[in-house]
């Protein structure tokens, strides 16, 4: 690891990303700030772990955080199982190849989604229901989209903590 982070900064939509950020803070001893709080608390270019929720493989507000801070690792929290979609998320987010990326499964709470995001999930559900010969992953995803679920777990932090404590 080139630069050790000195804080965790996050943005959360339904609370799952906030919970992961706080779990990481609990395991590392790093202070944790919501993005708007961080602007008052942290100087520019502070090395941080940034955590944001995933939407269409893009980590919410990553670019905003990267303009202000030195993002030394990125955690994207979304629907996909932990450790999946790394290539897609890196590309959609515009994350440099040398920056460690971790995806963490958060879950789904349709009622907690605001604005256009709920409508987008409804559209995704309708699209997936029309799919002929869905895979097991498709079926599991559709079930989660419809029924909801919470998968935030300390167990999902293995790769993040391994990276943090390396060297």
Regions found by a protein language model. Name each.
Residues 1-68, 158, 162-167:
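N-terminal beta1-alpha1-beta2 submodule of the flavodoxin-like/Rossmannoid cofactor-binding fold
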Residues 54-167:
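FMN-binding flavodoxin-like domain, especially the glycine-rich phosphate-binding loop
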């Amino acid at each position: 690891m080139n630069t050790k982070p000195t804080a965790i900064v996050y943005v959360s939509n339904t609370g799952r990303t906030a919970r992961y950020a706080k779990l990481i803070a609990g395991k590392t001893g790093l202070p944790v700030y919501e993005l708007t709080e961080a602007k008052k608390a942290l100087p520019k270019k502070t090395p941080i772990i940034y955590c944001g929720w995933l939407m269409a493989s893009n980590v919410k507000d990553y670019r905003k955080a990267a303009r202000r801070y030195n993002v030394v690792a990125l955690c994207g929290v979304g629907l996909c199982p932990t450790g999946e979609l790394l290539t897609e998320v890196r590309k959609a987010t515009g994350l440099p190849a040398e920056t460690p990326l971790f995806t963490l499964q958060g879950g789904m709470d349709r009622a907690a989604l605001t604005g256009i995001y709920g409508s987008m999930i409804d559209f995704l559900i309708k699209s997936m229901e029309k799919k002929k010969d869905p895979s097991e992953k498709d079926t599991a995803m559709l079930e989660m989209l419809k029924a909801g679920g919470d998968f935030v777990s300390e167990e999902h932090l293995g790769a993040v903590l391994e990276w943090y404590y390396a060297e």
